[in-house]
Amino acid sequence: MHVRISVAALSCAALLAACGGNDSRTTSDASVPVRGGTLTAVVPQPGPCIDPQVTGTDPQVIVAHQVLDNLVFENNTGEVQPWLAKSWTISPDGLVYTFTLRADVKFTDGTPMNAAAVKANLDRVLDPKIQSLADAIYLVPILKSTEAVGDFVLKVNLKKAYAPLLHFLAQAFIGIQSPAGFSRGREANCQDPIGTGPFKIQSFTPNAEVRLVRNDNYNSPPPGSQNTGAAYLDRMVLKVVSDPAVAYAALNSGEADVIHSPLPQSWKTIKKNANQRLLSQVRPGTPNVILLGVAKAPLDDVRVRQAISYAGNVRAALKGAFLDEMKYEAGPLSSATSDYMAASENAYEYNPAKAAALLDQAGWTGRDANGYRTKNGVQLKFQLYYSLQANATAPDVTLLENMQSYLKQSGINLVLGQGSATEVYSMIAAGSITAVKGYSGIAGWYWPTNTPDVLRLMYTSDGLRAKTNLGGYSNPELDSVLTKAAVTQDQQQSQALYIKAQQMVSDAALSIPMYPATSRLAYNSKVHGLTVDHALGLPNFYEVWIAK
């Protein structure tokens, strides 16, 4: 949720985001790495705390990912590999995971990374005072207890089997921290989480910058790394710049070496600039969607939701708004997610005739003076929340306006409501889109996560209980399919279940997919070795070096 209302959600935080587009994963050209230097990167505002176990947002973990290592690593094919844990076993019933840890790794405060330390991290997840949304959603419902059965052997006992567990443990939200840091108290640890990673926090100025220095003793690089020791950079400065236009100007002037989420209007220019590069990678989880509140009329009728999907012509609306720079994503899961259903790509192609037939069947047969359909004298309309804060862009708004125009042609009144962050937080707190007066949909909602289990959290009764199913949908058959998938260790069986679930979610038209949530970084051509991780789509600076 890693909206994460995602947990992200709240990362998501359901704000219209400038993520998406080029699906290709690129890295900077590499020759012989050069050691030394300071890299300045513009990143999103991480808030007053950079401990990813507290709250848990994307901006937090961009920082934490440079400081903390994880028990396990997820490579670019979605395979889970050893990292701080060099091996593990899973009991036949899926209730006990036993991890054997590396014995040669220390935190940057000099204390050992051992079973007791990892136990302290997982036990901390259960502390409600920590208020981690990511951990609360994924781990609290399943984690029963932990036991250090040796100096470097940890046993994790679950309340119920959870097949995606290893994938979640690869996310930076559960990066392993020094228990000595925890002993300082929640607020102190917020300013300086201590890890085993390639960098350590030098200073943190909320709303301004985070300064990192190299961990000269680093010896635990993730699998597949070309570098085997300390990072190439001496230090990094992660600057907060709220205005994307100002961030782009900083890249052009040389004040910044890397900027996060450049404006869509700048993508073509960056690609043509011999001194700049653009790295793009689709994030797993969900694409950017219009999430629909299905508990109230008129969206409680599946025929109306399907008609909207057929009549909105998202493909054309997207092309017109982003000038062919953004790929359309048609399914409930991102194409970068394991068990993605490729057949989704053909769902809900523009078909106003089919939309008209569905609306006729649903009883919306009248017309008012403005040409909108009516039923019993009531106009067919729904109000969509969107925000012009943070990374929202002009093309995002144009996309919605284009859809609004197409829907009007079919007699559907899409009312665009520019809302505040307070309103979306109210929806999240209540666990319902319709909790905020007037709204029946959220534009720009996405949930980056590396497991298709996100469908269970967003669209089932489990999600209603956890307040992560903001659309309010409930279907016992879908509940059964996704609950079974979450406990199934057999990959072929779980894949079949997730594909079935995707088809059910698509058929029910619970959201309107738009474009993929994409990690996009623009950087100076002197920067080499920049990559994006697969688990959450976070920038990796460990192997970055700057040409002289």
Tell what function each PLM region has.
Residues 218-269, 400, 405, 411-415:
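Ligand-site clamp/hinge motif
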Residues 170-237, 352-353, 357:
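Gly/Pro-rich hinge or "lid" segments in bacterial periplasmic/extracellular proteins
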Residues 21-23, 128-132, 146-147, 202-213, ...:
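Extracellular/periplasmic solute-recognition and catalytic clefts
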Residues 42-92, 123, 194:
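N-terminal lobe/hinge region of extracytoplasmic solute-binding protein
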Residues 43-62, 84-86, 111, 164-174, ...:
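A structural "hinge/loop" feature
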Residues 100, 135-181, 198-205:
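Surface-exposed binding/hinge segments that line
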Residues 199, 293, 328-368, 389-398:
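Structural transition elements
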Residues 205, 209-210, 311-342, 353, ...:
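Detector for C-terminal structural segments
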